[in-house]
Amino acid sequence: MKSKYTARPEGKQSGQGLVFDSVTKRFGGKVAVRDVSLKLEAGERVAVIGPSGAGKTTLLRLAAGALQPDVGTVRFDGSSSTGSTATLAYQGETLVDRRTALSNVLTGRLGALSWLRGFIEPLLPQHPEPALERLDAVGLVGRADVPVKSLSAGERQRVAFARALMQDAEVVLADEPTANLDPSSRRNVIDVLDAALDGELLVTVLHEVDLALEHFDRIVGMADGRVRFDTPARAVTDDQLDALFAAGASTPGTDAERTGTEKESDIPVPWYV
């Protein structure tokens, strides 16, 4: 059944794109992203695919401003109509365990720093309907009053995603939003992502190539930190996919996301970006 969720106020004008200009990012001397140039337009649905360690998550964190490039620039391109330009929902995002799912999602409206999380309950909006709609969209409205610490890993991920959607950002970045979900829920989550947006740019890292090809307009294939192809979904070929994943398998020594002295996963990411 289609959710009643409508994520953006009527009349909101979105015109924000994202530009990577010759971007390189290193960790401990290892290159995670190398010489990437992309221009992503407002309203596009972009899936980033590739083998593990290809630089996909690093690319999203550069887009969110959680990481800075060593070479090149990342910038927003277009007119911004809100104070919140980009929101990042990534796998394993930290939630406040002792608070309920609803309380966590409500904090998505705030631009507070993470260290204030334990002190913000008095500031939470008194009308929970928008947060309940987002929980409904991810299939958790029946768990709204359950403390996050009692939720499964997949449920926690969906709560984090619902919270990110509360920010009314113009660029939405989702790192493996279908991870830890059962097969029947994966397509629902992708449908939720699409329905949530109205003119915003969506950039999603996915491991499920079939979902990427079915639900996204544009596919960016990454391996060894490089963009191997950037193609409309309808034009992606089996040969391109075979070469993409073969490239990742043949270059394990360049996997900076896993082998750098400063691992990407060790770098804290602000929950509010």
UniProtKB/Swiss-Prot annotation:
The family this protein is said to belong to: Belongs to the ABC transporter superfamily. Phosphonates importer (TC 3.A.1.9.1) family.
Residue spans crossing the bilayer: none
Matches recorded under SMART domains: AAA (SM00382)
Assembly description: The complex is composed of two ATP-binding proteins (PhnC), two transmembrane proteins (PhnE) and a solute-binding protein (PhnD).
Enzyme Commission numbers on file: 7.3.2.2
Keywords for the protein's UniProt record, in alphabetical order: ATP-binding, Cell membrane, Membrane, Nucleotide-binding, Phosphonate transport, Plasmid, Translocase, Transport
Function noted in UniProt: Part of the ABC transporter complex PhnCDE involved in phosphonates import. Responsible for energy coupling to the transport system.
Compartments it resides in: Cell membrane
Residue span, ABC transporter domain: 18-249
Organism: Haloarcula marismortui (strain ATCC 43049 / DSM 3752 / JCM 8966 / VKM B-1809)
An annotated Gene Ontology molecular function: ABC-type phosphonate transporter activity
InterPro entries named in the record: AAA+_ATPase, ABC_transporter-like_ATP-bd, ABC_transporter-like_CS, Metal_Ion_Import_ABC, P-loop_NTPase
Pfam family, one: ABC_tran
Binding-site residues for ATP, renumbered to this chain: G50, P51, S52, G53, A54, G55, K56, T57
Membrane topology: Peripheral membrane protein
GO cellular component: plasma membrane
Name assigned to this protein: Phosphonates import ATP-binding protein PhnC 1
Gene this chain is encoded by: phnC1
Main localization category: membrane
Reactions catalysed according to its record: phosphonate(out) + ATP + H2O = phosphonate(in) + ADP + phosphate + H(+)
Enzyme class: translocase
